[in-house]
Amino acid sequence: MTPSQVTFEIRGTLLPGEVFAICGSCDALGNWNPQNAVALINENETGDSVLWKAVIALNRGVSVKYRYFRGCFLEPKTIGGPCQVIVHKWETHLQPRSITPLESEIIIDDGQFGIHNGVETLDSGWLTCQTEIRLRLHFSEKPPVSISKKKFKKSRFRVKLTLEGLEEDEDDDDDKVSPTVLHKMSNSLEISLISDNEFKCRHSQPECGYGLQPDRWTEYSIQTMEPDNLELIFDFFEEDLSEHVVQGDVLPGHVGTACLLSSTIAESGRSAGILTLPIMSRNSRKTIGKVRVDFIIIKPLPGYSCSMQSSFSKYWKPRIPLDVGHRGAGNSTTTAKLAKVQENTIASLRNAASHGAAFVEFDVHLSKDFVPVVYHDLTCCLTMKRKYEADPVELFEIPVKELTFDQLQLLKLSHVTALKTKDRKQSLYEEENFFSENQPFPSLKMVLESLPENVGFNIEIKWICQHRDGVWDGNLSTYFDMNVFLDIILKTVLENSGKRRIVFSSFDADICTMVRQKQNKYPILFLTQGKSDIYPELMDLRSRTTPIAMSFAQFENILGINAHTEDLLRNPSYVQEAKAKGLVIFCWGDDTNDPENRRKLKEFGVNGLIYDRIYDWMPEQPNIFQVEQLERLKQELPELKNCLCPTVSHFIPSSFCVEPDIHVDANGIDSVENA
């Protein structure tokens, strides 16, 4: 095939060590794999921007799609191997740039990085080969800093974190792999402050750091290629620098220092935990107190290369509020009016889908042998047989994580509510149903393969939560390693999702953070109960109120929040507040089962409503995605124009309008399948 020499040009400014690169749909552009992308070369400065170019041979007459990103190219791990690529920012327009070269030589001036067809759409990258360390200081359980000296008893403290790499002897290497390839990645540090009112992200700190406040979450994010080779130094200062200041000190108000070697975290073998570090005085180097440092380690998803072909992490197409089937056809165990189909089974999910549910919501966690299973509770009841008893049936509560997938399929298991049932034997017989789609504990892979792709999945990732009183969900104070747990679930979804619409959600803020950092395709919503009279308050400060949940979602750059209906009915302004911040908002809770409440919530402007027994309110019908697909076909095929099937107008009221604050790509939305 005749080649065409295409010169791609883009303008933009970079940080030291960064380059622009191009990635696209053909071999020459890496087949959407950023590791095989082509780096652009700096040509000359033009005003406030710099011109970057790359000359690439493409097949003449063949259409090619592509995107630009900025990041770092690092030396290969092995001789002759591919470069390690770190993506900092990339273009995520729903429709990528495209070209069909028809001449032997052509120059493509793509203007400013991130702007395509007049619309700027950029998103942050994900972890490709680097590790992210998060260190947090907060008052969720107790004040993070405790100093024993009397003169500091009433002091408030400021903290500054300094990041240093441990010294290593390095050979001088004057032979560069290329002008765009770095020998090593520079460690990065970002400081974040999250509260009800706002969030702040900074790459620099005041000389005396930031103040610790009871209502504020302070977080330090470090990206590094050497997670076990860092020295992290916390310096503590008095909040009120007008008192206890020793004249002539280099750092007025300096109280003491705590040091953490990242190897301590690495050697613990844990993805999350709490470390207590001694605080040493500024002069005598005696221990004067301690600091509690909450940490998580986020590792890249192993054995899976994320594609740049498309991303929905921050994309939401404006529609009327979507109906989402709670646990499929509804709660069948603990609510006032139980669903007629057992919850979280394929039959239940299929029932909701057949009644027009746009999405079905269900819960996923792992069996003992690391198989992702669909089940709501962290524990279940195992049937025990007693000897020499008139009633041989006894129920024993056991964590789901203690049973293998085969055991979950073969053993006679009951929901924990069976413990409260007077006739336990009868409750067991009622649950017995050998039709496979009615069986509890289907695997996530089985569910992905069984339901039609036009049904969206809202996958809630289960994790243990601690209540403010110290009690843990399911009385489980320990659980799986968070990285291993998520890697298995995410790979199962990414490898089996096809073209299905998927939205993740979780009550655990760290799960939301990790899902965002480990993959670039699917969005996640932060589940929050806010202020509730129904449920006990959670320990995590980020879960306490709906406003701080919004601030967290903004800080993590996730799609939005899934708020408790009880809190939204009490504070309707939260809905528009979330939208003004560019967030999508779903709602959940028993109050959503009331049709009058659903009417109010739709008027408020929520994007999705999760509720039980959709079959009670909607007849068997196609969902909105199927109707939209039919509308597209009608436009493309004239013979379908007179079809009497439901149309989009059946779902869209006259008052419907586009929400300008939600990330929406206006270019060719309807031509992208399953957007």
UniProtKB/Swiss-Prot annotation:
Major enzyme class: hydrolase
Record-annotated CBM20 domain positions: 1-115
Residues reported to bind substrate: R70, H88, K89
GO biological process per UniProt: lipid metabolic process; skeletal muscle tissue development
Entry-linked SMART domains: CBM_2 (SM01065)
Annotated InterPro entries: Carb-bd-like_fold (IPR013784), CBM20 (IPR002044), CBM20_GPCPD1 (IPR034839), GDPD (IPR051578), GP_PDE_dom (IPR030395), Ig-like_fold (IPR013783), PLC-like_Pdiesterase_TIM-brl (IPR017946)
Modified-residue entries (Phosphoserine), positions: S178, S427
Keywords of this entry: Cytoplasm, Hydrolase, Phosphoprotein
Molecular function terms, GO-annotated: glycerophosphocholine phosphodiesterase activity; glycerophosphodiester phosphodiesterase activity; starch binding
Catalysis: reaction(s): sn-glycerol 3-phosphocholine + H2O = sn-glycerol 3-phosphate + choline + H(+)
Pfam family, one: C2_GDE1
Xref: PROSITE patterns: CBM20, GP_PDE
Major place of residence: cytoplasm
Keyword Hydrolase (UniProt): yes
Similarity-based family: Belongs to the glycerophosphoryl diester phosphodiesterase family.
Role noted for this protein: May be involved in the negative regulation of skeletal muscle differentiation, independently of its glycerophosphocholine phosphodiesterase activity.
PANTHER family per record: GLYCEROPHOSPHOCHOLINE PHOSPHODIESTERASE GPCPD1, GLYCEROPHOSPHORYL DIESTER PHOSPHODIESTERASE
Name assigned to this protein: Glycerophosphocholine phosphodiesterase GPCPD1
Gene: Gpcpd1
